[in-house]
Amino acid sequence: MFKGHRIIVIGDAHDSPHISQDRFKWIGKYINQCEPDYIIQIGDWGSFDSLSFFQKNSSQAGKLKDAFMVDINSLRSSIKLLDKYIDNNRIPRHVTLGNHEQRVYRFEENIPEIAGMMKKELHDSFLLNNWKISSYGEFKYIGGVGFTHCPLNIMGKEYGGKNCEVQIANDATNDIVFGHTHKYRDWKAPKIGDKNYVRIVNVGCALPFNHVEDYAKLNLTGWSWGIVELGIWENHIQESQFISMDRLEKQYG
């Protein structure tokens, strides 16, 4: 009998009150059809632009930011929409919190009087809907493979650059699945020793097809929009399939 794990990984969704949530229906329908053993959302489920440090509140852009609870209510709406179309409460589901969820922690850190209040709203959004969570930078292990929003280097910073998967593979001692850069990549690095190799999969993002966030519109992007289906056994990622958001929309929209 096959004893591996079939896992659907949803990349950075960057939910916002200003972006259509239709993609959560399509993803939910796909998950309902394929019935995986686990569902992982790799973090940055919500953008939390209300807490952005890049637009100061005194600036024109800052004055137009939504309230924190507007972002929270949008996040909760997207979670409920996804779960509605998954329509299967038996599948374990987990979120590895990302740097955009970390905005909530950073904001609270600067205002001691509200310590715990905003984090509770964030955590309850997931926990009350049966999504477990792990902290930013922490690994969630399934079948010997580590899942995290983005691995952190020796300086506590995210691995980055054009070939960050190669850098991660150089330092990793087990297979890793992550997101953050919005680019789907699958890198297998040979190793000396019993494990023989490590495999690093970057799952891209789960934004609408061809949607680029405002902060990156003039950047070098090469983003990948979709979800990833993984097969894990013998402590390795053995299968990796990228399903584009365009295909999901055509099939389930």
What residue ranges belong to the model's regions?
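Conserved acidic residues
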Residues: 37-39, 91, 144, 174-175
